[in-house]
């Protein structure tokens, strides 16, 4: 009886994953069809957050949209479940399709990618096959990550939640896990000055060690930190604030 129940659960989960993957193109088409803007901020939420804006990045995105006219935001459509690799893969496919359709429809439109927790992994996975010669590399002006499980040590853009360097040498828990895109996929974006990677001191998601406790309190500080929200908004505004034209022109 237990075996049959387990088999049924596995089958049900596989159907859910297929359905989520099938919805990627549909949602990307709906969002990219909304018209061209000077820029779009794509927001990928963390594990178990409800579909919609992430609580950790909502403030900085609102500040950016208010300070820099002509933009809009989109929220990545994906499960954000504890099935990390499957869930993040669905999100990455959605983001990549959104970007490809967007640059085809609105070639002058700029992009910023913002990711929190699993949403940061979604972001890196979505960019894994975007080379420096890809038009998307030029179109993507900014990447802001909070509590990144793929955080790499000593890269440009690494700061802590007080804009210091206490976590500059940190490595995320996902770096040695199956599914890590590889440092060679991440480093060029950072060296181009396009990345602000904020890792709070003690956040074991982005500052992992074998002795890490199970206290996830530091992973939750981003949403309530005015300094984090201001730093993110400042970075986004600076990177997106160059001369832009409507994508349809």
Residue ranges of model-derived segments:
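Short coil/turn segments at beta-strand junctions that form active-site/ligand-binding loops
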Residues: 37-38, 107-111
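Gly/Ala-rich beta-loop-alpha elbow adjacent to hydrolase catalytic centers
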Residues: 113-123
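Alpha/beta-hydrolase active-site loop
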Residues: 85-103
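Short, surface-exposed "cap/lid" segments of acyl-processing enzymes
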Residues: 23-71, 75-77
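Fungal secretory targeting signals
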Residues: 1-25, 249
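Extracytoplasmic/secreted cell-surface and envelope-processing proteins
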Residues: 50-53, 83-85, 121-125, 152-156, ...
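Second-shell loop/turn segments in exported
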Residues: 46-51, 80-89, 110, 219-222
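Surface cap/lid and interfacial helix-loop subdomains adjacent to catalytic sites
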Residues: 43, 57-65, 75, 97-101, ...
